Amino acid sequence: MAEEKQNEELNEQEELNETEAETAEAEQTAAEADAPAEETQTEMLEKQLKELQERLEEKENKLLRVQADFENYKRRARLDLEAAEKYRSQRIISDLLPALDNFERALQIDPDNEQTKSLLQGMEMVHRQILEALKNEGVEQIPSVGEQFDPNMHQAVMQVEDEAYESNAVVEELQKGYKLKDRVIRPSMVKVNQ
């Protein structure tokens, strides 16, 4: 019986050794199987990380473009507002210029009696006040006679030959031109020397 017991113990020991060997082999196989799985998972995580970084960079670039667009919009709006303020009176001044021309023509009359002289003096005073008010608003008359012809400031309606003037010089002003600050409201209508 002792021999049987010894055999049983040996069998149990062998079974235990076999089980341990199988367990060790299974663990090794699992570890080997896990290693590629871990590598695959690492590669997958790295790929996801790279994609997320690219998306983040894309979003940051988009945000920078939106911010730049917004800054440009604010700058344009500010410039438009400044221009609107600077030239706010342009329309009414443009409408007043023909009346001013007629007023200046009326001042050209030759007074034949004392009453007409008095009226002319009053009109000259009003004319000076109108010109002063326009000057305060930033309106200036465009210089013409004797100046070089500038297509931005002058409108040539005739060409003449006059030795007293240089070539391409304005000889005569037919209608006054005006600027509002740096913008031409109406160009001077002129005769130009050839």
From Swiss-Prot:
Compositional bias segments (type: Acidic residues): 9-25
Keywords in alphabetical order: Chaperone, Cytoplasm, Stress response
An MF annotation (GO) of this entry: adenyl-nucleotide exchange factor activity
Subcellular location: Cytoplasm
A Pfam family annotated for this UniProt entry: GrpE
Entry keyword Isomerase: no
GO cellular component terms listed in the entry, alphabetical order: cytoplasm
The keyword Cytoplasm belongs to this UniProt entry's keyword annotation: yes
PROSITE patterns: GRPE (PS01071)
Location (main, coarse): cytoplasm
GO biological process, one term: protein folding
Role played: Participates actively in the response to hyperosmotic and heat shock by preventing the aggregation of stress-denatured proteins, in association with DnaK and GrpE. It is the nucleotide exchange factor for DnaK and may function as a thermosensor. Unfolded proteins bind initially to DnaJ; upon interaction with the DnaJ-bound protein, DnaK hydrolyzes its bound ATP, resulting in the formation of a stable complex. GrpE releases ADP from DnaK; ATP binding to DnaK triggers the release of the substrate protein, thus completing the reaction cycle.
Family: Belongs to the GrpE family.
PANTHER family: GRPE PROTEIN, GRPE PROTEIN HOMOLOG, MITOCHONDRIAL
Assembly and oligomerization: Homodimer.
Protein's name according to its UniProt entry: Protein GrpE
Lineage: Bacteria, Bacillati, Bacillota, Bacilli, Bacillales
